[in-house]
């Protein structure tokens, strides 16, 4: 199990611990669901949970929120850093103030912590999905759906975001196994679904044998889908998504998407909080905790064991 090796008990009221969670952004079902998982752990362990984030994925918005949280002096901060390089120094301020740092979903540096080397070594743990594996899973499923031939591309946010970088890496590496498939240039959309839609229409206009698109995050996938529909190619160009809010899963049911890779964000939030609490109460903490995936398709989305991983909207 993902949290194996973590052993903690509920705090007495006099020893109540405060831990903060800063999501990548608040307006995303993934982080809403992560927050729910963290709340469940906080309730179970008697923790005061602070939750604050920006409405969009933006370093210049996340850093002031981080600074404000540091000023409240929690025992630990769980954070999904908006950039793996630009958040190193701001998070080092938390560490220097005696606040433990746990990276959830995204990471700083190379995501390998507590090794004794490097400027981004100080977080105590990284709790997340294996995003390279997730990208590979998307590639395998998309390759099958297009008959292992044709051109595909990745619709992505921007470089230097750890998770989406890794999803693209895994996708492209896995696609090398299919000689009949050519991966063409990635389209970066700055997390703007409208831009992703326009890019999809432009690629469709110039690549006559485009067979599929992999949307590496929510807005990349939604935008690509809108572009495909606007071009009149729904069902002809196969779409693979990453993440599972209802805005994606409803379009699995109607055939717009072939599949989506659902992460388990509630587990990330839960085990992230447990890790931070374990450290604050002087218990051992693994430096990395992995959570799983569920591949969702039109054929399995109504299965309760699959549907339970659809992200919460509120």
Where are these regions (language model features)?
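A residue-level marker of the well-folded mature domains of exported/periplasmic proteins
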Residues: 12-314
